[in-house]
Each structure stands twice: as structure tokens, then as C-alpha cells.
Amino acid sequence: MKVSWPGENHWQVGPAVVESPAVGAPQVGGLPDVVPEGTLLNMVLKRMHRPRCCSYQLVFEHRRPSCIQGLRWTPLTNSEGSLDFRVSLEQATTEHVHKAGKLLYRHLLATYPTLIRDRKYHLRLHRQCCSGRELVDGILALGLGVHSRSQAVGICQVLLDEGALCHVKHDWTFQDRDAQFYRFPGPEPQPAGTHDVEEELVEAMALLSQRGPDALLTVALRKSPGQRTDEELDLIFEELVHIKAVAHLSNSVKRELAAVLLFEPHSKAGTVLFSQGDKGTSWYIIWKGSVNVVTRGKGLVTTLHEGDDFGQLALVNDAPRAATIILRENNCHFLRVDKQDFNRIIKDVEAKTMRLEEHGKVVLVLERTSQGAGPSRPPTPGRNRYTVMSGTPEKILELLLEAMRPDSSAHDPTETFLSDFLLTHSVFMPCTQLFAALLHHFHVEPSEPAGGSEQERSTYICNKRQQILRLVSRWVALYSPMLRSDPVATSFLQKLSDLVSRDTRLSNLLREQYPERRRHHRLENGCGNVSPQTKARNAPVWFPNHEEPLPSSAGAIRVGDKVPYDICRPDHSVLTLHLPVTASVREVMAALAHEDHWTKGQVLVKVNSAGDVVGLQPDARGVATSLGLNERIFVVDPQEVHELTPHPEQLGPTLGSSEMLDLVSAKDLAGQLTEHDWNLFNRIHQVELIHYVLGPQHLRDVTTANLERFMRRFNELQYWVATELCLCPVPGPRAQLLRKFIKLAAHLKEQKNLNSFFAVMFGLSNSAISRLAHTWERLPHKVRKLYSALERLLDPSWNHRVYRLALTKLSPPVIPFMPLLLKDMTFIHEGNHTLVENLINFEKMRMMARAVRMLHHCRSHSTAPLSPLRSRVSHIHEDSQASRISTCSEQSLSTRSPASTWAYVQQLKVIDNQRELSRLSRELEP
């Protein structure tokens, strides 16, 4: 007899087959869990390669109902009806992977003809295959952007998952070993060495490299906890860091979870995961897909999506399930924690927790950790240390001062503790409270001589004061650009300097230690540069000399700075006031009244280009720098609010700049944009991210103007792309402009300006641009492929994993995608309480500081390479007659000059009204 499925080869099955009653009547719709040896079905399954991305179904032919005549497989679908866009996209991705596998197979055969051959292992002959190690070696030798064995293993795992590669024994996990053999299915491909095929191979390897980490993570999760390697546990832990459901847990708990998580897939929508009233046995985290939460009497209560969790309450309270969970879509994946593991982790955490009390109240909560212990590595005896989990501000500061050591390295846990505290103290310990506490510690002396010796008592006091000075030096280094205009801070520093000058022993130690420390342990400031701190005098000199300016602070907006407030009237006349950047709306109205431009009863509102009006609260601060793109402030009588119209300048340009852009190459334009963006990015103080997420209502006398200016630039760039394309009326030049913007995005990515790269790509994906089908059709095939390759970095799945992996591979200087960093900060802030049992949740502060330090890493090289155009500015002679000998007009020459291009990229004029962009788009292509 023959067993087959449509479109594949037929295999002959011998007549000596014994039917077993155990599999004589399997149900249509799925394969049995256990198939006994010697049965027909068992033999078929052994011979058949079944990709994991497919489901399988038994099909009985009615001519012989007592025998299994055939077996067919059908792809998983995500809906009961017709395939939707998501299914089509998944199928297209599978097709791309199969095509990539064939291209790789062809190239490997052409480069290494003996790679695929018959192999004999343990007296068994395996036809036309290669070992896992040889396949990885071959992929690495090809280059093509693959630089490590783990990356090559990920590529092979993707091919294995999609059926483009198969194991000779149908194992699902790719292994980089000599004794594991794999083959490419299908006939041997014909050789082809054209240039187009090579480009397709590069594109194919980029696709496989992008999907490789996800495949390796899936394999790690599918393994039982006891089989996971250290590297796989680290990989799972990094995934948990970005999952919303566990954001409130400490890193030690996340590492414990990484060791016990179980992978649980379900293929069919409508499957009931558990029912209301069932006994709670597991906690679930949605890794892929969504579920409906249904209760008796209320029906559908809510829908949970990727990153959400459910089932924890029943475990904590040891109660029955409070709702029924039903799969909302096909192919859902869950991360499961069983009850016994959950309870063990909770007990372990409690056992490692130490609480310090004063006067009957808990003032500090510490957690015991082991230095050098990873998620799977056992603790090292004798190397335990305690990490602050929560506490009062004063106790956290006291513990920090006790833990500081003068000889600690940059990677010492105490240094990280100090950095976390300094970056986040404004959230829980304002400067005035910090100053008072530090002065108190400076004056406090032990009640009894330490060890009974007056000398040791004096040494203890001196060491403690040294630690205070070291903390203050680090604090000044971090915040020095913001402190010069702060009278409270300068008064505190003066008091501390006076106290130091009265202590002879401390002054002598400072004179000996600080010059050497400046050479070997230079302190970081808020912009990622270094600055000298304390000088060898009787008292510390906290700020750098004027001869040593901080280059990155030039042009930054500080708290005491005055900025222009452009106030519009209903008749569109404009009044400009210069007020402090942190001025409140009430103070702005008072300044207007002082200038006799405000009458009683008038209010301040902001109006955008679409005519939407939003009132400004009297206590709102920094409204001038927080305005959105093309927004203006209006002073108006309340009865005239609904009659306001946008200022003409808010509406944007009516003519495009395509002629000027034609004269500048995409690479030079990217260089100009990157240099301008770097200047804006370098002026952002690290702590502005924390202030921005907390909001001005939580913190006074701070500004986030530099960060808001950078964010406004992101919006400006994406609308600039859409504006220029919508204002280009001729199809040919419009297609050329579209091509230039795609190349611009590629150059921005190459220059590691990821923020502007995302802005340009978002502009190209604007609905007003994506609908211009005739314009996109004019693009060459190569440019369309380039755009498709760039789009992969925008993939938002699994919390933008593709972008995050790409970012980790880049060396500084880098301009990161700022909106995602702010999203992470908001995620941390809103997902974790600032107070836990009336104590500061310092674990939350630690997570926020870790996210903020990304800015310092990206700016650890303080200068960005100048763009080619800017580097030539100094060589341009204004009176050069030779430059005028050209067929171009003087206007064209001035347009293409570096100075004019530099001015253009700084003052982009855009249309940000989506309705207007859509109208222009419909006029171009109805």
C-alpha cells in the first residue's frame, strides 16, 4: 500500500503491518498522543517531516473505512473563517523563509560541494546530509552579516521551524554538533551566480538573522526547566525584563521565574483554558495571542493581550478560579508557572528578605543576593551582599554612606547603588531634604569611641566625612550644568566647603587624594563627558573653571533661563515675552497684565493647526517648551474661544522643497540631520527623562525643555517627509523624492541615528503616503526591496525585540529611538508603586536608573562625526569666481551650499494636520 499527502512524495509501506486496536479508530482532527510501535501510523510518522508551524489531521477514505489510507496536513489559521491579513502575513513570511533556505542551500553547494554527502554514524547510513557543526561553520564562512555561532544556530533553527531544513530523525531542536545530521528538503537546486541572486541571498540572510533570536528563545522555552543552559536562562530573563506582567517583580524573582517557566501552546480559538470554579494550579502570562475573560452572569468582562497575566490571584489566596479563560484567536502561546514553583519562589524571596526596624516600624527592607550568581549559577559561599528593596529616604542614604568605599571600581555594586541614588533622589528625596541629611551626617559623631580608641574614633569620623564629600562630588558632577543658577545648592556647597576648611586632617587628605583620583577615576557629568572636580586646596572647588567648559551643555536650556513666549491674539497679532522657562500660566498672565496686554477675565489656551483648542490651567508650568508641533498660545476672552482660528504660520507651507532636495545627496542630507539631532540629543540631561515621566505636577523648579525639544524634532521629521511628498505635484519627481527619502532612511540607519530613521520611516508609512500606489509603482525593484528590509526594524512584536537586538549590537555614539525609551520609563513608573508599605520602592528607582543610563551609554563617545557638507564649510570662499562658472544659477548654487542646507534642516516647515495631508494626497492620486 502507499501512504501520501497532496503535493509530496509517496512512500511504499511493506505488507507486514499489524493493525493495533489502540490506533484503529483515531478521531479526525488530530493525531493521537501516543502511537504504538509497529503500526502503520507509527511508520508514517517516522518517515514524515512535520514542520512545527503546522497542525495535522487524519483523513479517512470512505472506500475502506477500516484502514488509514492517507495523511494530510493543513497550516494553522488564526480565524475560523477566511484568512485575514495577519494569516496572509504569516504565510508570506513562511514563503520567504523557504525561499531563503533554498538560496542558502544553493550558495552552500556552490561554495562547499562536499558539504552535502552521505554520512555513516553508528552503523546507519544517512543520505545527502550535513552535520550541524559543518552547517554552522559553512554559514559563518560565507560572511553575509553572520558573526557568531549563536547567530548561525538561530538561522538554522528558523529554517528547521519552518520546514526549510529537517533533521534526519525529525528532532525539533537544532544542535551545533558533529553527530547531528540535517538535510535540505527538495531536489538539489540549479547553480546560479548572477548579481541579483547574490543580492537576494544577502536579503535572505538578513531576514533569517532577524528571526533567529526569536527562534532560539522559543526553543529555550519549549525545553523543560532542567534542560535549559545558562545562556538560555539568561535569554529568558532578558525577555522577562520587558514583559508587563512581571514588571513589578525584582530582578532576583525574575531570575527565579526564568528557571521554572513552562511553555504552553494552544492552537484553536475557543479553547477553554480553565473554567470559573476550577482549582487554581498555575499562573499564566500571555506571550502571544489574546484571551477573553468570562464570568457567570456578566459574560465577557475583558480581553487580555500579549504581556498580560491571569490566574495569580487564585494561587495567592488558594481560592477557586474567579473567571473562565477562553482563547480569543488561534495559535496562542502562554508562559506558565505552576503553583508549587510559585509558592517556592515566594518563600525563597521571603527567606532572603531582612527587615530593619526602629521604634517598632520597618525603616529598611534588604534582600540577600550573591555576587556573581546568575539565573542558573549557584551562590558563592561567603560572597553574599544585601540589596536595598525599600526604605525611608534617610535610611537609604545612611546605608549608602556606610557602603561606599574610596577604592571601589566603576563596576562595583556600590558604585551602581550610588549612581541609582543620585539619578533618582529627586523622586523621593528633594534637594533640600538631601542637603539637610548630609549636613546632619557630617556633624554626627559616634557616642562612644570606636573600639575604645580616640584615634580610631577620629579615623571613623574622617572616613565618614570623606564619603560625604565623595557623594557630593559625584552629585555635582552629575548635575553641575543645572546647579550654577540654583541658590539653594550653591549655599549648601558653600557651607560644606567652610566645614571642610575647618577640618585640618580632612583638608590634608583631600590635598593628597584628589589630584590622583582625577587622573584615575574621572567623574561623569549629566551629558556623558568628564569634568575635573575637587582641587587641592583647603576647601573643595565644586565646579570646573570657566576655561574648561562642558561642550555638550552649550545651547541647553536650564531652569533659570528665559525663553520667548509668543502669545497670539484672536486677530493673529503676536506679542513676545521673555520669561523663565518654568514660568506658570499664572505668571505669564501677570506679565501680560504688566505690559497692558491682558484684561481681567481673559484666559490662555493653546491651538493646534487643526483648530483644536485646549485650555491651560493656571498652575501649568513650562507651557512654551511643551507645545506640540505647530501649536501656539492664544490669549482670549472665554466667549471668543470657539471663534479662534489657527495662525497662518501654523498651517504649514504651500510649496514643497523638492528642487532644493534634488541638489543634495541622500547621504549628505542624512549627515546634516544627524549632526543637528546629535546637538539636540547631547543637550538632554539624563534626569530629564525621569522628570518627563513623572510629570511637572510631581516636581517643581525642574525643566524638561531639552527633551521636549528633541521629541518635537521627531514629530517634525515624520511630518516633513509626508509634507514634501504631498506638495510634489508631478509623478516623476515625486517618485524620485520618495526614492531619496528611502535612501535617506538607509543612511540614517547606517549613521546610527535611529531616532530620525524611525521618524522618516513613520513618515513614509503615513496613510497619506502609503496610499499613493502609482508613485510607489514607479520605484525600482531594488528600492522597494530596500524599503521592505528597512521596515523589519519597525516590527513592534514582542516589545520591539528586533530594534532592541539591533541596538545592542551598535557601539556608541548612537542616537536611540527616544519614544520607545520613554515608553519603557512610563512602563516602569506606572507598573510599580513608588511607595510600598509607606517605604520608598527603591527597586523601582533602580529600574528607572538602569533605563536612564542608556543615554550615557549612547553618548559615551562625546563627539559625532561631522557630516561631509559641514566639514567643507570652512573651505568655501564667498568671493570665489570659479564657483560661479556653472550652468546653474546663483540661486541654485546658494541652495546647494552647506550653509543653506544646514539652515534648512534646522527650520523645517511642515503640515501636521492629517486631514490636510489626506486631502493633498487625494488630489495627487484620486
UniProtKB/Swiss-Prot annotation:
For this protein, the parts annotated as crossing the membrane are none
Q: Which residues carry this modification: Phosphoserine?
A: S79, S531, S867
Question: Where, in this chain's numbering, is 3',5'-cyclic AMP bound?
Answer: G311, Q312, L313, A314, R321, A322
What cystine linkages occur within this chain?
none
Domain Ras-GEF, by residue range, is 665-892
Task: Indicate the segments forming the N-terminal Ras-GEF domain, all copies.
Answer: 384-521
Where is it mainly found? cytoplasm
What PANTHER family does its record include?
GUANINE NUCLEOTIDE EXCHANGE FACTOR, RAP GUANINE NUCLEOTIDE EXCHANGE FACTOR 3
* Protein name in UniProt: Rap guanine nucleotide exchange factor 3
